[in-house]
Amino acid sequence: AIWKQLRALEALGLEIESVKGFGYRPPDSFELLSKATILNHIAESHGDLPCELEIFQSIDSTNRYARERAEAEAISGTVVLAENQTAGRGRLGKTWVSPFAANLYMSIVWNFDQGAESLQGLSLAVGVGVRRTLVELGLQDVQLKWPNDIYIGGKKLGGILLEMIGDPNGRCTVIIGIGLNVAMPSLA
């Protein structure tokens, strides 16, 4: 029944509008991630990259899942995206509020051969890359705040969470988590 589907969407935090005489509709700013669109954009702008892309409607944490994939020998460059996280995490174990289809929740698996010492400054390098991308997309006044925050116009836009697994003195894998508050609802 339609009401079960509506309840399932509401359970994800998506407000469904009832339009008398017409039915139901999602909010106007509703847009889901598209694997085909993302892969086409990557191919057009960077050529074919040897990466794997996984998109979830809902997941507990993209970083947790990416970590599991890395422990199962995922290829370097594996990207995990989600429309919703039920247990998103920020730095120092803080909760990362992750409403459905409102923001960007992404984790990247990346392998390094030189160990933890060679990773000094990685958080800053990732932040610079995110900032550069946002500026290329037309955003202005994008700033980085040490150690992992991204701001626009003095307001927090997102954050970066790095987690390392493997040998601190040799081959290791870093899970690079990036969360961006694209369309954060005012109640979140």
Where are these regions (language model features)?
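Long, positively charged amphipathic alpha-helical accessory segments at protein N-termini or as interdomain linkers
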Residues: 1, 7, 11-12, 114-142, ...
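Solvent-exposed beta-strand sheet faces enriched in polar/charged residues
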Residues: 17-19, 145, 163
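Short flexible/disordered coil segments
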Residues: 89-91, 141-147
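N-terminal lobe of the biotin/lipoate ligase/transferase fold
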Residues: 3-136
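Hydrophobic residue at the +6 position relative to the catalytic HRD Asp in the kinase catalytic loop
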Residues: 24, 149-151
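Active-site glycine-centered loops adjacent to acidic/histidine catalytic or metal-binding residues
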Residues: 88, 149, 179
